[in-house]
A protein has these predicted regions:
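Short, Lys/Arg-rich, polar N-terminal cytosolic tail immediately upstream
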Residues: 1-8
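A structural signal for multi-pass alpha-helical bundles of membrane permease subunits
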Residues: 9-300
């Protein structure tokens, strides 16, 4: 029996995967299933609750705060993901060149990503403070402004402030991953295109971008997922304020379920995020399949 398992790669692989699969079932599947169940109940903290069907979801559709949180989440995800992509791609192209000390710069660029989220959020909270902001202090000393900017006191200032914090933290992940993709592109493609008279822009458009598209699809999928479900940055910097202007679906779910004690309502908000996350995953999947088909791969 043991010899058969050793000779069967599939069976041996399944055995090695079993411990991880059990852990995933315990720590991922069970909480997800419990969350789905709670979303259909009126459970409160300390009280199991009863089955109420879709009442929580019907209430959320008409709830103005939930509607605002959905808008904030989509706006936050769209702007932050786009900025992270363009800045990350620019940094990746820059670091892919033969620069002096490029190894050092590649290491430095990872610092925002490896710093604990709560620590970086506290730093940004200090940077955006209405009284002690170093940004406002510098601008006042330079004569650009007369009074300190209230970064977190008005809705739109707060929205763009937390977007800036998310971009600062997320750009390294995009840049390093795209840089790894650029390293896989053979220099012979660029040499051949240069012989044909291609300009740097034409090389980027017709060589770099098509070959990098699968990596871009994967990176942006993870970027969108991480941004859409962001919690720590928002909770530490603004806690959803001012006037719920920076509440995301994740922070609102926490506020309703933990702070407010409405476990069923909070769970319903969390489950309502799932269709948007699935849409992002499916968009990436079909994008990869389309690119594989265009490049002559198997159309699955």
């Amino acid at each position: 029996m043991l010899e058969k398992l050793q000779n069967s790669r599939n069976a041996l692989g399944l055995i090695f995967m079993l411990p991880a699969a059990v852990l995933l079932l315990l720590f991922l599947t069970y909480p997800l299933g419990l969350g789905v169940w709670l979303g259909f109940t009126d459970a409160k903290v300390g009280r199991p609750g009863e089955w109420i069907g879709f009442e929580n979801y019907a209430y959320l559709i008409t709830d103005s705060v939930t509607q605002l949180a959905l808008f904030n989440t989509l706006f936050y995800t769209t702007i932050a993901s786009a900025l992270k992509f363009f800045l990350g791609l620019w940094l990746a192209l820059l670091l892919n060149k033969n620069l002096r000390f490029k190894t050092f710069f590649r290491a430095v660029i990872l610092l925002p990503y490896i710093v604990p989220t709560a620590l970086s959020a506290i730093a940004f909270w200090w940077l955006f403070d209405s009284q002690f902001s170093i940004i406002s202090w510098v601008l006042v000393k330079m004569g650009v402004i007369d009074t300190y900017i209230d970064f977190l006191g008005s809705p739109w200032n707060a929205r763009f402030s937390v977007i800036a914090a998310n971009v600062w933290r997320g750009v390294p992940f995009v840049a390093i991953t795209l840089l790894a993709g650029l390293q896989t592109i053979s220099p012979s493609y660029y040499e051949a295109s240069a012989i044909d008279g291609a300009t740097p822009w034409q090389q980027f458009r017709h060589v770099t971008l098509p070959l990098l598209t699968p990596i871009i699809a994967v990176v942006m999928t993870f970027s969108v997922l991480f941004t859409f479900t962001d919690f720590q940055l928002i909770y530490v910097i603004t806690r959803g304020g001012p006037l719920n202007a920076t509440h995301l679906m994740a922070t609102l779910s926490f506020q309703r379920a933990i702070s407010g004690g409405a476990l069923g309502e909070g769970a319903a908000i969390s489950i309502a995020m799932v269709p948007f996350l699935l849409a992002a995953i499916m968009f990436s999947y079909f994008g990869l399949q389309r690119r594989a088909w265009q490049q002559g791969g198997a159309d699955k």
